[in-house]
């Protein structure tokens, strides 16, 4: 298990990926304690002075004008968590739940939420003990924060709802806490709202999509380079001079990645160096331009999501230095929704371009390979239907890439009359990534088959490694066989990031 000393507001993308990918043991940096304590003191001072402050001694949403008596404040926070735990759908997996909890810890520890250190430490205790709250996937519109999923997360702290320990069976939360030696807690004024208000679920959903997009981008560059070799494509379109004069950073960097793979020691490239072909189709020739645009979208989304991962998205906010509590709208996840929409465009385009390269290899006039990449065509259908599968997946992503951030539906009796739909924007990225991974799997299989058919010729060392990785699991296609297991094997290799490792990281 990895250890992380959490300095509030300073998580990096690589740390966020690690938190999502592996169990983690968190220690909160002691430098955060003073600001946390000062924000609690500010809340207590407001109560002692008899002042009215939203979320501290009032109702919520349309009931914000209702003043709550001092003796009901603890019950108010408990009731808030219970009533807002109204999500539906399958529970989030351990990795996503852990990321949500760490994002919430990071935000609360900034010291603007009026929540006690002991409550934050209780949430850290869940993470360190491997306790996963039952968090249904659906039920948030991304404003006022991710109320339902964060309420389900918070139930476990109270000993309510369901949870599991290190991937075990779902249990009553009290039993899960007992197994790891933890006790339920009681919330004080403001603390229930601090736990529930925020964009942590939306941000975690989109971050998962971002990590998927980064991996898909790298895998697609490798697959595209393999196809370029298999189809006897030209290296000239990757010349750095072309991309420097345009000045698009994503395109420049993408072209460099292709050059990293398409090195001069390729016998295939040398075999057609002086051929008469003037131009390649766009799906080969314009890879740096299209993939560079995708890289730019991914990077811009990463910048937004990194800021949000380190943000304070609670409401109201406690500014202890000024003894002030201000009700605002940092819970509105519009930046996350728009970032997720941009990631969706990139994932869709990565798959769309890959599908076109697959189609190119099926066409013997374009690729100079046997039709559908198989000998004795007619008796054998080869990759014919595998390309159809890729087309189906790429087409489905076109519909899924419709922007969610332009959608809104009023809630809470029109008090919350514009919402972001960020959770849905992030959640659909997972299905899109699965589709694009399927397309890339077919391309990898097809490109390896095409390279095999360039008998006696090898490609560059890195691309030979990519071919070898596949051939360890999937043999050369000599005649028709049950095809689905081959695609599944390629998908598994892609999901394990085997091709991603052939390139440097593109986000950090």
Swiss-Prot record:
One of its GO terms (cellular component) is cytoplasm. Pathway: Amino-acid degradation; L-histidine degradation into L-glutamate; N-formimidoyl-L-glutamate from L-histidine: step 1/3. It is found in: Cytoplasm. It catalyses: L-histidine = trans-urocanate + NH4(+). One of its GO terms (biological process) is L-histidine catabolic process to glutamate and formamide. There is a cross-link at residues 143-145 (5-imidazolinone (Ala-Gly)). GO terms for molecular function: histidine ammonia-lyase activity. The modification 2,3-didehydroalanine (Ser) is found at residue 144. Its EC number is 4.3.1.3. CDD domains: PAL-HAL. It is an enzyme of class 4 (lyase). Keywords: Cytoplasm, Histidine metabolism, Lyase. Contains an active site 4-methylidene-imidazol-5-one (MIO), which is formed autocatalytically by cyclization and dehydration of residues Ala-Ser-Gly. Pfam families: Lyase_aromatic. Its main location: cytoplasm. Signal peptide: none annotated. Belongs to the PAL/histidase family. PANTHER family: HISTIDINE AMMONIA-LYASE. This is Histidine ammonia-lyase. It comes from Klebsiella pneumoniae subsp. pneumoniae (strain ATCC 700721 / MGH 78578). The lineage of its organism: Bacteria, Pseudomonadati, Pseudomonadota, Gammaproteobacteria, Enterobacterales. The gene is hutH.
């Amino acid at each position: 298990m990895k250890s992380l000393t959490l300095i509030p507001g300073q998580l990096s993308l690589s740390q966020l990926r690690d938190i999502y990918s592996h169990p983690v043991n968190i220690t909160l940096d002691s430098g955060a304690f003073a600001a946390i304590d000062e924000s609690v003191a500010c809340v207590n001072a407001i109560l002692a002075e008899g002042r009215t402050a939203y979320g501290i001694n009032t109702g919520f949403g349309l009931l914000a004008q209702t003043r709550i008596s001092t003796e009901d404040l603890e019950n108010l926070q408990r009731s808030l968590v219970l009533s807002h735990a109204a999500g539906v759908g399958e529970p989030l997996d351990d990795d996503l739940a852990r990321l949500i909890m760490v994002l919430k810890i990071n935000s609360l520890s900034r010291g603007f939420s009026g929540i006690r250190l002991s409550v934050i430490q209780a949430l850290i205790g869940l993470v360190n003990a491997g306790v996963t709250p039952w968090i249904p996937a659906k039920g948030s519109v991304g404003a006022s924060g991710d109320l339902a999923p964060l309420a389900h997360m918070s139930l476990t702290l109270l000993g309510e709802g369901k949870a599991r320990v290190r991937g075990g069976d779902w249990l009553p939360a009290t039993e899960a806490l007992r197994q790891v030696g933890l006790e339920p807690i009681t919330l004080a004024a403001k603390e229930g709202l601090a736990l529930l208000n925020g964009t942590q679920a939306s941000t975690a959903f989109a971050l998962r999509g971002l990590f998927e997009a980064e991996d898909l981008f790298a895998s697609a560059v490798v697959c595209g380079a393999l196809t370029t070799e298999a189809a006897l494509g030209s290296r000239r379109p990757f010349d750095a001079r072309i991309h420097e004069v345009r000045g698009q950073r994503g395109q420049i960097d993408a072209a460099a990645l292709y050059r990293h793979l398409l090195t001069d020691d390729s016998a295939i490239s040398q075999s057609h160096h002086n051929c008469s072909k003037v131009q390649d189709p766009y799906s080969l020739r314009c890879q740096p331009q299209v993939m560079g645009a995708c890289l730019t979208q991914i990077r811009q989304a990463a910048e937004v999501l990194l800021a949000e991962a380190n943000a304070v998205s609670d409401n109201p906010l406690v500014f202890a230095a000024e003894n002030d509590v201000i009700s605002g709208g940092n819970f509105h996840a519009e930046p996350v929704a728009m970032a997720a929409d941009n990631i969706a465009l990139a994932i869709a385009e990565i798959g769309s371009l890959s599908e076109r390269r697959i189609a190119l290899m099926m066409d013997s006039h374009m690729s100079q390979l046997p039709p559908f990449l198989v000998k004795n065509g007619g008796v054998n259908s080869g990759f014919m239907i595998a390309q159809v599968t890729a087309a189906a997946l790429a087409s489905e992503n076109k519909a899924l890439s419709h922007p969610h951030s332009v959608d809104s539906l009023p809630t809470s009796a029109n008090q919350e009359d514009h919402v972001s739909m960020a959770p849905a924007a992030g959640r659909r990225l997972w299905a899109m990534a699965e589709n694009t991974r399927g397309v890339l799997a077919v391309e990898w299989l097809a490109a390896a088959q095409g390279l095999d058919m360039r008998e006696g010729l090898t490609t560059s060392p890195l691309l030979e490694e990519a071919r070898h990785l596949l051939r360890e699991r999937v043999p050369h296609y000599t005649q028709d066989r049950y095809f689905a297991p081959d695609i599944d094997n390629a998908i598994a290799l892609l999901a394990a990031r085997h091709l991603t490792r052939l390139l440097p990281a593109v986000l950090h």
